[in-house]
Amino acid sequence: MRSNQDKALEVWLDSDLAPACLVGTLAHDRGQVRFRYDRNWLGQARAFALDPDLSLDDQPFFPKPELGNFGVFLDSSPDRWGQTLMKRREALQAKDEKRTPRTLYAWDFLIGVQDFTRQGALRFRLAGTDVFLGNEKMAAPPVTTLRELEAVAFQLSSRRIDDLDALRKWLTVLVAPGASLGGARPKANFTEADGTLWIGKFPARDDDRDVGAWEYVVHGLATKAGIDVPPASLVRLNNDFHTFCIQRFDRVKGARRFYASAMTLLRKEHSEGSSYLELAQFLRSNGDGARAGADLEQLFRRVAFNVAVGNRDDHLRNHGFVLGTNGWQLAPAFDVNPNIDKAEHVLNIDDADNRPSLQTVLSTAAFYGLTADRAAQVVEEVASAVDSWRDAARKAGIAAADVELTAGAFSAHSEYRA
């Protein structure tokens, strides 16, 4: 009997737009992944290509070997933090079973995610069954467990852990709520008192600054600047540093929203050399009808804000889109942080320049369908919101030395005001 690693999975679309529907089959056989649409899906009026590399054709599709899977399924899989949890669990299980640890690949990470917290609206189950993969009850524990989750995540963020009994206990607590999430920092899903799904982003053992508090500060500035961001909160639990909590935007009143990263929809393998103008072009070509113009202005506002606050780790997986009734909509902003370790943005501001400059942002106004006057107004609104960044940092309890250390991230804002 073959393991889950070598069985075909039914791929279901369960979004807020229509009843759940089987859309295809994703198979893994001897290291090779293939996908094929269900013929009933191909015949439906609402059918759409899940991924730019998966056209609506009745044929098998194979991903690029270097990726190991299609972008839309990679978006449903964990990034570095979730992968770290899974790798540590596999190493511990291998030790307990007196065997060599398996090397985990893209397929393993996909099937290792809990269904309840999986990003987006795709769900997976073994063919012939009616239970979706990953149905543990504690995939998103209640907010009352947040203190325990933070404490465990702090321990698991260590590069080396020698106490295997402690590791076993910690993984039992955190793998289910934490393994679905992207990014490199420790985090976990949890359920708020009103039933909404949230993410807690925790301090790491090697932190030398209050990363969570800074994300909260920038979140508040973003709200003032007219940036679309989900609700958020800041708590201090076991640590000198804070935990930043933010509501999941891919859930609406309990329903799932179909989400894809900019990396996937732009058919990219990496972000270097890419530009914000490519995101604008995607919205012009594939945006959701009546709101496409507003989304383009929101994207321009977001570029200006990222430059003003030094959010320079702005790679294509940190931008995304959710599917609307008539096309793609710009997803709310997420993972926006002042970055003191990068002098330039990952994405180019115009077609070639990734240096942080609000003047460069202004020069791109026409690509977003904005007049020069409207663009100047938007940038001024953003700059006015960011003017208070020092006061906001102090109110969040960030130490004065940390404020001065982070000032370089706001250099483009300072230059604009000079």
Where are the model-predicted features located?
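Phosphate/dinucleotide-binding and metal-coordinating scaffold of catalytic cores
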Residues: 1-316, 320-418
